[in-house]
């Protein structure tokens, strides 16, 4: 089973990441954590490439990397990745471009074989739908949108089961009703 966990920041996504990793552990699933950053204008792609090269030489991070670094720290603190990965620190220099708007870093997990951290740029709904279609995730875990209906919109168009985290409290026990169809679960 493959699970996509969509995050946006420490402030708004800590509950989503916590629940997502607990679900991945419970189902022995392969978790992928994704952050969707702002869309890069097509006219400025060349300038962005030059800026990224300069940022690397100046040891500055590209936008969105700090969210992935926070997710790495969370995975480290909760021992979801191997000790060797933790000791090496966040591998921002091994962020691999896997498409025009998609970069990925692979980590060796303790819950399952691999944990992936992905940074995408663009409109959040479009990018998450594209990610699910391309990688064939079984479940997408997102946080409840506070100010918009993006969670509702995503639930209408995404081609996977969806789990929306809303006001999760660590000290409570929850029951989850899993509605399934005739898929390979």
Regions found by a protein language model. Name each.
Residues 1-61, 76, 83, 157, ...:
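Small/aliphatic-rich secondary-structure junction motif
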Residues 11, 17-19, 117-175:
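Gly/Ser-rich helix-loop-strand patches that form or flank binding pockets
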Residues 40-41, 91-92, 148:
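Short secondary-structure capping/turn micro-motifs that flank functional sites
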Residues 61-68, 99-100:
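Well-ordered, non-membrane alpha-helical segments in soluble/globular domains
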Residues 73-140:
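Structural beta-alpha unit
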């Amino acid at each position: 089973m493959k699970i996509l966990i969509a995050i946006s920041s420490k402030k708004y996504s800590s509950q989503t990441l916590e629940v997502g990793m607990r679900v991945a552990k419970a189902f022995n699933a392969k978790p992928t954590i994704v952050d969707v950053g702002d869309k890069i204008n097509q006219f400025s792609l060349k300038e962005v490439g030059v800026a990224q090269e300069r940022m690397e030489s100046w040891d500055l991070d590209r936008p969105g990397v700090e969210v992935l670094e926070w997710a790495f720290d969370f995975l480290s603190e909760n021992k979801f990745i191997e000790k060797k990965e933790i000791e090496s620190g966040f591998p921002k220099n091994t962020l691999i471009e896997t498409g025009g708007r998609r970069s990925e870093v692979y980590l060796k997990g303790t819950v399952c074989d691999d944990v992936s951290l992905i940074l995408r740029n663009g409109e959040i709904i479009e990018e998450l739908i594209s990610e699910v279609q391309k990688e064939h995730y079984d479940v997408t875990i997102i946080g409840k949108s506070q100010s918009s209906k993006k969670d509702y919109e995503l639930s209408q168009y995404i081609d996977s089961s969806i789990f929306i985290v809303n006001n999760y409290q660590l000290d409570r026990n929850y029951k989850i009703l899993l509605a399934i169809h005739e898929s390979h679960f």
